[in-house]
Amino acid sequence: PWRVGLSATVGDFEMAKRWLNPTRPDRVRLINPPGATASIKFSHLHFIAAETPPELIDDLYTLTRDRKTLIFCNSRAEVETITAELNALCRRDKREERYLPHHGSINKEVREAAEARMQDKHRAASVVCTSTLELGIDIGRLDLVAQVNSTHSVMSFVQRLGRSGRRPGAPRIMQVYTVEPGPESNAPFYERIPFNFL
């Protein structure tokens, strides 16, 4: 019998070999095509604010308005709010609304329409989503991935980063935005640590 393992996130190949064939890991063949390792371009903007500031939305809009992008958020409410704010900027600029929401509470047909729009090579689109598009669903080739606030795990971060840079020679590009209220002046030390930033 043959066993095949595929992963975009495994870093310890020897451990993966032992997992695939515990008795004979030396018989596991690793196929890693030349050029498969993409360079990574990463940027992070941190805002001290009680809620998502307009500057974040403006920067996100400027970065994504002409690119195929997945914009990950950590809640459905955040997806809906950011989608509405980005589409308001499209209307302000007399552009077609190109930001589509995608999360588990949205009707299946609406989610599938967003996925189909992302696969359309002739129309610019960005999907603002929760973890629903973190893996598994083919949405075509992306120009970049954006993340609003920290992911809940390192694995989620790696999966989301891995959605971009799938063209030969293309870098993986991720823009991360974090927002955190400033600490009160008399707050204890541990409350002054910007955990969302970290």
Question: What function would you assign to each model-found segment?
Answer:
Residues P1, P22-P25, G35-A38, Y61-R65, ...:
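Conserved catalytic network of the ASCE P-loop NTPase/AAA+ motor domain
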Residues W2, K121-A124, V148-L198:
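Conserved segment of the helicase C-terminal RecA-like domain
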Residues W2-E80, V179-P183, F195:
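Conserved interdomain linker/interface between the two RecA-like ATPase lobes of SF2 helicase motors
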Residues A8, P33-G35, G104, T132, ...:
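Short, ordered loop/turn segments at secondary-structure junctions
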Residues M15-L20, T81-L86, A113-R117, D138-L144, ...:
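Alpha-helical scaffold elements adjacent to nucleotide-binding pockets in ATP/GTP-utilizing enzyme cores
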Residues A77-R98:
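Conserved helicase motor "Helicase C" RecA-like lobe of SF1/SF2 P-loop NTPases
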Residues Y99-S131:
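Conserved helicase ATPase core of P-loop NTP-dependent helicases/translocases
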Residues V128, L133-S150, I173-Q175:
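A short beta-strand element within the Helicase C-terminal
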